Amino acid sequence: MFELDFRALQELIRSQRAKVYEKFKRHVSINDLLSDRWETAEFYGFGEGTSCYNNVLILGDVRVGKNTWIGPNVVLDGTAGLEIGDHCSISAGVQIYTHNTVNWSTSLGV
């Protein structure tokens, strides 16, 4: 059975945080310390060279082209399909929603 050494894990996190702060002068979440933004984008099937923060909320059918940057705390709602092209920059906190306007408005959003 796998036994986790929490003290070693805490030390690893402290060490990684210090390295990131020294290099970039900023603090990042544990998720961002342990996962790679390009790996996250690849997991979602986004285009080559695209980076996507771990805390992005992705709903429905979202397609993203090559070399696009998706910042932290972004919401991409592809409920009615969403396609973002190549070489785009989606800033932190941006929220993009799609839906069938006629159906949505006549159903009172239900």
For the regions a protein language model found, what residue spans apply to each?
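Flexible, glycine/small-residue-enriched loop-and-beta-strand segment within the central core
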Residues: 30-35, 44, 55-64, 69-110
